[in-house]
Curated annotation (Swiss-Prot):
Gene Ontology MF, one: ATP binding
Gene Ontology biological process: selenocysteine biosynthetic process; seryl-tRNA aminoacylation
Domains as described in the record: Consists of two distinct domains, a catalytic core and a N-terminal extension that is involved in tRNA binding.
The protein, known as: Serine--tRNA ligase
Compartments (UniProt record): Cytoplasm
InterPro entries to which the protein is assigned, alphabetical: aa-tRNA-synt_IIb, aa-tRNA-synth_II, aa-tRNA-synth_II/BPL/LPL, Ser-tRNA-ligase_type_1, Ser-tRNA-synth_1_N, SerRS_1_N_sf, SerRS_core, tRNA-bd_arm
Any one cellular-component term (Gene Ontology): cytoplasm
Gene transcribed to yield this protein: serS
Length: 428
């Protein structure tokens, strides 16, 4: 969430910056609520001071042998008024907090202005798409012919947007995840973590999935008097980042760099009719996630390095890709700046997103109270958090199958994956 003090003191400027990402902040309503908050705060403090002053006079009256009943009645009346004002203030603060939780992050000044994905800006390309001398097939046809992708069985068992992988295709899927983890932990300095696949509401609030995107989640257990509800993770970003919730990290221990390979679960509530064929958009998919916790002054450089770590996976797999910076109107809710990496898919004759790398600055940290303490500082300060896919395993599998296909329908195994597949050079 945004800094409440900044919202109060820079309301008009905040509204202007939010408008660039298509979010209309109700300035008039917020101004009125803020005036009411000030009024209630002042009234509460005045009533508290009056009650304290009169309460002190009770002892003095008793010492003089005076009747304290009128004073006691006055104190009681002030107490009732104070309780009423406190309740009004608490309800108002709850309203203000709910509004603050619904406001997206401010775009960084370096983010290009734009309304939607058509105004994203390409920043670089790597590799040249292969020219095939035969008609290319998509991953669905190739995978089904090889007996490695079974969509029909998945539909029978669960429903649409699920997959059963078998044989060497399943092995390649596993090999990709292992390769990514080994790369990030041995060459990029990340610590591997094994995390829960179920998280509570406080964790989802911390990383920004709640309250706005509840319909995108798979909820497994509703909230009760005994505890919070539980939901399946949409990304390992949620448990990895929440490790820092309500903690103070020593400056000497920064940056914190974590990675995890997990299944991810998304309802794809707003994606009806999109990418209905194949593995591109599934309810359950594997992903290797990258998370960094850094000092504020280091976060933009960290975004560049994190994006580079994700790109390295594609470079080692020799898959052509391009990197774009998202414009203000296409960024995610909690992001201040995002780079999307798009891999070349021959069957679609286009680049498709395979990773999204974002700097959240202190947006998540404020929600989670994730802080660090510098030696020279008197008080802890909020961390900056970053996250990105390194990579989405299923989409990487799609890219490998399509880019490494042969005319006879077989798939050449990329050299970097062969050690993970017992030296296998070809599937089929």
């Amino acid at each position: 969430m945004l800094d409440p003090k900044f919202l109060r003191t820079e309301l008009e400027a905040t509204a202007e910056r939010l408008a660039t990402r298509g979010f209309i902040l109700d300035v008039e309503r917020l101004s009125k609520l803020e005036e009411k908050r000030k009024s209630l705060q002042m009234a509460t403090e005045e009533l508290q001071a009056s009650r304290n002053a009169i309460s002190k006079s009770i002892g003095q009256a008793k010492a003089k042998g005076e009747d304290v009943a009128p004073i006691m009645a006055q104190v009681g009346d002030l107490g009732s008024q104070l309780d009423t004002k406190k309740q009004e203030l608490a309800e108002l603060l709850e309203t203000l907090n709910a509004i603050a939780m619904s406001v997206p992050n401010l775009p960084d000044e370096s983010v290009p202005a734009g309304a939607d994905e058509s105004e994203n800006v390409e920043v670089r390309r790597w590799g040249t798409p292969k020219e095939f001398n035969f008609e290319v097939k998509d991953h669905v046809e190739l995978g089904e012919t090889l007996g490695g992708l079974d969509f029909k069985a998945a539909v029978k068992i669960t429903g649409t947007r699920f997959i059963i992988m078998k044989g060497q295709i399943a092995r390649m899927n596993r090999a990709l995840a292992q390769f990514m983890l080994d790369l990030h932990t041995t060459e990029h300095g990340y610590t591997e973590a094994y995390v829960p696949l179920l998280v509570n509401e406080e964790s989802l609030l911390g990383t920004g999935q709640l309250p706005k995107f509840g319909e995108d989640l798979f909820h497994t257990k509703p909230a009760t008097e005994e505890g919070q509800g539980l939901s399946l993770i949409p990304t390992a970003e949620v448990p990895l980042t929440n490790i820092a919730r309500d903690t103070i990290i020593d400056e000497a221990d920064l940056p914190v760099k974590l990675t995890a390979h997990t299944p991810c679960f998304r309802s794809e509530a707003g994606s009806y009719g999109r990418d209905t064929r194949g593995l591109i958009r599934q309810h359950q998919f594997d992903k290797v996630e990258l998370v960094q916790l850094v000092k504020p002054e280091d976060s933009m450089a960290a975004l560049d390095s994190l994006t580079g770590h994700a790109e390295t996976v594609l470079q080692k797999l020799e898959l052509p890709y391009r990197t774009v910076v998202l414009c203000t109107g296409d960024m995610g809710f909690g992001s201040s700046k995002t780079f999307d990496i798009e891999v070349w898919l021959p069957a679609q004759n286009t680049y498709r997103e395979i990773s999204s790398c974002s700097n959240m600055q202190d947006f998540q940290a404020r929600r989670m109270q994730a802080r660090y303490k510098a030696k020279s500082a008197k008080k802890p300060a909020l961390l900056h958090t970053l996250n990105g896919s390194g990579l989405a395993v299923g989409r990487t599998l799609v890219a490998v199958i399509e880019n490494y296909q042969n005319e006879d329908g077989s798939i050449t195994v990329p050299e970097v994956l062969r050690p993970y597949m017992g030296g296998l050079e070809k599937i089929g």
